[in-house]
Regions:
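Polybasic (Lys/Arg-rich)
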Residues: 58-151
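Core beta-strand-centered patch of the WYL/Sm-like small regulatory domain
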Residues: 1-65, 70-75
């Protein structure tokens, strides 16, 4: 059995997710279509300090595939042809900064996860992690591991 204090519903990758506080896992996500046997209890909802200040719309954009984790500032560089994709993912208010004639940079908070790396890898050489170096190095290591499978 799970007990969760609900905070928000978000739409991600064709599914609704409940963002909630779990006694076991803290801030977590549950895919709504996978829920069964729900019960409303008389237990008071847990409202953490984190939840009181969290912008759930922004949070939903930072999380890829609803993987939990700590959000961190990530600076990315894309070819101009991907501007529409970035705006679709992060919203029309995303600030795209020109970087030469063929690229732009974009800085945002992202929960770094395998799903984020997979999304980025799909763009091949048209996208690059610029900062932080730890995220850049982890992505490069993931790419090397995958490449080893094909040698």
């Amino acid at each position: 059995d799970y007990f969760a204090s609900p905070y928000a519903l978000v739409w991600d990758n064709e599914n609704y997710y409940l963002i909630a506080h779990s006694e076991r896992h803290g801030l977590t996500h549950y895919r709504v279509d996978k829920m069964a046997k729900l019960t409303i209890t008389q237990k008071p909802r847990v409202m953490t300090e984190e939840a009181k200040t969290l912008d759930f719309t922004r949070y939903g954009k930072a999380v890829f595939g609803m993987f939990s984790g700590q959000a961190q500032q990530v600076k990315l560089r894309f070819q101009n042809s991907l501007a529409g994709v970035v705006l679709d993912r992060f919203g029309k208010d995303a600030m795209l900064v020109p970087d030469g004639n063929e690229h732009f940079t974009f800085t945002t908070e992202i929960v770094v996860s395998p799903v984020f790396y997979g999304w980025l890898a799909g763009f091949g050489e048209r996208a690059e992690i610029l900062f932080p170096e730890s995220v850049r190095a982890e992505f490069a290591a993931q790419c090397r591991k995958t490449l080893e499978l094909y040698k």
